[in-house]
Every structure is written in C-alpha cells, then in structure tokens.
Amino acid sequence: MFLKTCCSGSCTGISFVDSTPIRVCKNKRIKANKVFKGTAEIGKSTMGWFYGFKLHLIINDRGEILNFLISQGNMDDREPLKKESFLKKIFGKLFGDKGYISKQLFEILFIDGIHLVTGIRNKMKNSLMSMNDKIMLRKRSVIETVNDELKNICQIEHSRHRSFINFIVNILAGLAAYSFFPKKPSIKYQTVKTNQLYAF
C-alpha cells in the first residue's frame, strides 16, 4: 500500500508499458525447485523460455513507476491492461511493444480515455500514425532501461529465495528503492505540430 500511494509517480499523458521476466531458478533446475512449486510457471520472453513470474510495469516519460503487477510467467502481456485497477491513474497515450497488439484491447482502452499505441508486425497491413507517435515509439526503450536498473541495481531478480513471501518482499523493496533514485531514465521530446500522417 505504501509503495502504490507514496512511491508512485503521476501520469503526464505519456506512458509506457512493458513486462519483464523474473526468473526464480535456472531452467535446468526447474524440476528440482520446491519453493515455487504450484506458483511459478514456465513462460517465454524475447530472451527465450524461463521459469518464474512476470513484472508488468507502467511508467511515465520521467521514468517514474505509475503502477505494477506481478503475475505468473505464462500470463499474456495484454491481460493486465484489461484490469481497471492497473490503469486507474492512466490517461492519454500508452506506448507498448508488438506484444500488446489487440484491436479489442485498443477499443476498450480508447473508451476509457487511453490511446494504446503499438508497432505493427511484419505481416500486418500498414497503419497510419502521426509523426509524434512514431517518434515516441522509438523512445520506448526507456522502460527497458528501467527494467534493467531494477534487476541490476535493485536486485529484484535472483535465485536464492527460500519462500514465496521472501520473493514478494524482495521485489517490493526493490521497487521502493528505485522510487527514491534521484536520477531516473527519462526521455526528452518536443511536440511537432502537424496534421500529417505516416504509414507505419
């Protein structure tokens, strides 16, 4: 409760969403792992298969965490965006990678005042996109930098947990520690006033 009320940032109208795997053990030790039996699941990320959980994050353009959700490793990245509690402070543009592509999800969020902006897959038809949105999509790497700092500086991922509660406390402590960083990854941008649309 303290983390979500006192340590979270405020939405600026430009937000980024992403998920990152939280591995609880090496793949070769999955069958031997007893601590997370029945809770952790096998999932797949851009880096391959893993056993553990996912940390879903929404940040603003200043690198401040707006909300987070911990799920099992096999959860679809789009599922948290269907939860009203996960998006209750979010408005404006929400930028995500291709894993968030969903026409139905886009329409649901649009009704709630959130414009979900994603890239397109290779075999999809080109879609019209404003130059501003195209530029902001290229700056989406800021949330990947946040994930990197959470893992490498705040140490939210390691394989030495002796209980599930210890695992959760470690993640929450890491997120709280990050919120007090004096300098966070952020983006600089200028709004381009144009009515032109670009094929993406």
Regions found by a protein language model. Give the residues of each.
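Short alpha-helical elements
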Residues: 1-200
